[in-house]
Design a protein with these regions (language model features):
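Glycine- (often His-adjacent) and acidic-residue-rich active-site loop
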Residues: 56-93, 113, 143-145
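Glycine-rich beta-to-alpha active-site loop
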Residues: 92, 96-144, 148, 324-332
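Phosphate-binding active sites in nucleotide-utilizing proteins
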Residues: 313-398
Length: 399
């Protein structure tokens, strides 16, 4: 197995360490899913395995989700909708197989867990996360024209309640480990060097663990169901906010709401198939492929200088000028100053220029920026009404 390393200890706990060769971050690939499927078969059939801990061998994080570049064949509906469903259902079914393998499974989350990476962790019975404030956990698929398609729309609402889950799902927001603990998305926080040990301790103490939604009498936090007034009102509001943001011109948000609404009223196995049904419809439409290409694939290529002319050395600017201190000009000035660049902020008079700098000060204060850092950033912004102050600028921008 090239993407999963196996290590069984004396207590019979199998540690699966995800470590994709040649990748800076773990992502879900066909090789990974094949390795995970083989591992699940071993877990089910080997009586010597008493439980499982899933973790990452990457210092960069746990897992960042699906390899979007490798999903190109799915986009645009090249085959039948049934064929697309069968393909997208495979990952959902695989995570469900892990969840129902008959052994306790814990995730030791050592870093970033996004998209399918978080969905994998949610399919584990227990989640221990590193307490580092730099870690982000989330399902950001909606930001690139998709939505979570490996159980995220069903497990997250069952953990934290429908209304708070929709806030994260529809906006693609990430949460900190502390927020995740408060929402019961993770069960425990520990230092990075202790998460595997804590996960193993839980596995040993819970030999017959099952997911909450597989227990008799499970109920959604906050309630769910078509006859629950609060449940219905939640979707009325969510639909209105989606319409305001997209004019219902985007497929993914509507499909996401439908998957959550329908799935919340069904047993988990049926709900997961509903999710895959809507996910297949989204990826079969050309819109999803176009958005992934523009917002992810092409963006990454541009950031790496894919079209940069050969033989021209980089010229990082040391001093730039903004012609106009309005919201956009002041915003660009703030970002540049935070990057260590001096900014001449020019407007028709000093009052207007100073107002632009004051906007930056207000933004930094609202973000609770460290006072010393705030002073450094503001010190790089030079308001003026004199065009002579543009002398020596490497770049002049008119927003």
């Amino acid at each position: 197995m090239t993407t999963l390393h196996h290590d069984r200890d004396a207590d019979g706990i199998l540690t699966l360490t995800i470590d994709l060769p040649g990748q800076s971050m773990n992502v879900i690939t066909p090789e990974f899913t094949a390795d995970l499927a083989a591992a699940i078969d071993t877990i089910k059939t080997d009586a010597g395995i008493k439980g499982v801990v899933v973790t990452s061998g990457k210092a960069s994080g746990f897992m960042a989700g699906a390899d979007l570049k490798g999903m190109g064949a799915l986009f645009g509906g090249g085959g039948s909708l049934k064929a697309t469903f069968d393909q997208v259902w495979q990952l959902n079914a695989l995570f469900r197989a892990l969840e129902t393998c008959g052994k306790p499974v814990a995730a030791a989350i050592n870093g970033l867990a996004l998209g399918g990476g978080l969905e994998l962790a949610l399919a584990c019975h227990y989640r221990v996360c590193s307490d580092s404030p730099k870690i982000a956990l989330g399902l950001p698929e909606i930001l690139v024209g998709l939505f979570p398609g490996a159980g995220g729309t069903q497990r997250l609402p069952r953990l934290m309640g429908v209304q708070p889950a929709l806030m994260y799902l529809t906006q693609g927001k990430s949460m900190s480990p502390q927020e995740a603990l408060g929402f019961k998305v993770v069960h425990e926080l520990a230092s990075a060097d202790q998460i595997v040990a804590r996960a193993k301790a839980w596995v040993l103490a819970n030999p017959k663990a099952v997911a909450p939604w597989d227990e008799k009498g499970f109920k959604f936090p906050g309630g769910a169901g078509a006859l629950n007034p609060g449940f219905a009102q939640t979707f009325v509001g969510a639909n209105a906010l989606t319409a305001k943001a997209t004019n219902h011109n985007m497929n993914a948000p509507i499909a996401l709401l439908s998957a959550v609404y329908e799935g919340a009223q069904l047993p988990i196995d049926t709900a997961l198939r509903v999710e895959s049904k809507y996910f297949a419809r989204v990826v079969a439409d050309p819109q999803a492929g176009n958005m992934v290409r523009s917002l992810f694939v092409s963006k990454q290529a541009a950031e790496k200088g894919a079209r940069r002319p050969a033989g021209i050395a980089p010229m990082p600017p040391k001093k730039i000028a903004m012609l106009g201190a309005g919201l956009m000009g002041a915003g660009v000035a703030m970002v540049a100053a935070q990057a260590g660049i001096d900014v001449v902020l020019l407007d028709r008079d000093m009052a207007a220029a100073e107002k632009g700098k004051a906007y930056t000060a207000d933004r930094l204060a609202k973000k609770r920026t460290d006072p010393a850092k705030m002073e450094q950033v503001l010190g790089r912004i030079h308001p003026t009404a004199d065009y002579a102050d543009l002398a020596g600028c490497d770049l002049i921008i008119e927003p």
